[in-house]
Amino acid sequence: PMEQLILKMDDKSDVNVIAASAYNFRIELVKKVGKSDIPGLIDISHCMADRFGTQALLTKTNIPKYFNSETLPFLARYKGEIIGYIIGVPLEYFKQESWAHFDVNLSKKNTLYTYAFVVNSKYRGKGGYGKTLKRIYINWAKKQKYTYVTGHVEQGIARRFHARTEIVKVFPEWYGLKTPFEYYRRS
């Protein structure tokens, strides 16, 4: 059945360009992912899998689950090539997950969970691509009336975020990874 989904997919993604620079860098909000972007998305997800294990890999099967009209998926492109993405998902999508119940805002529909945020390693720390992607994502979330943006990061990382970021809970075990992860909330 998944192959049928992919066959029905348009070749090109349906996107809104949210920001563009004169230097061939742009950020797009994906309304519907197209076949031509699947290889680039899968490639870039390998940058996440190196740190977070194979469950972080995007596949032909799970891409439509995260890149659709119910989520907030943004792509960063440089010279037409996908160099990063960030995916926001309403917290309520995760109500079956035990970790989500530590968030007092579950079921209030005011929290956007950052499911994935990755920038190709050769573009990290250069040109501000990742920072720009994150800033646009957070501003867009606010425009969509989300009060909070949350996510999981390796322990110690969230304290480098915005001043209005709090650590809700530390998870010593996170999906078999060796380092503890913290669940943060940014207002």
Regions found by a protein language model. Give the residues of each.
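Conserved active-site tyrosine of GNAT-family acetyltransferases
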Residues: 158-164
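Conserved acyl-donor/pantetheine-binding loop and adjacent beta-alpha core of acyl/acetyltransferases
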Residues: 82, 86-116
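Short loop/turn motifs at secondary-structure junctions and domain boundaries
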Residues: 64-69
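Conserved acetyl-CoA-binding loop-helix of GNAT-fold acetyltransferases
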Residues: 116-119, 125-139
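C-terminal "cap" of GNAT-fold acetyltransferases
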Residues: 7-10, 14, 168-187
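Conserved GNAT acetyl-CoA-binding A-motif
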Residues: 141-154
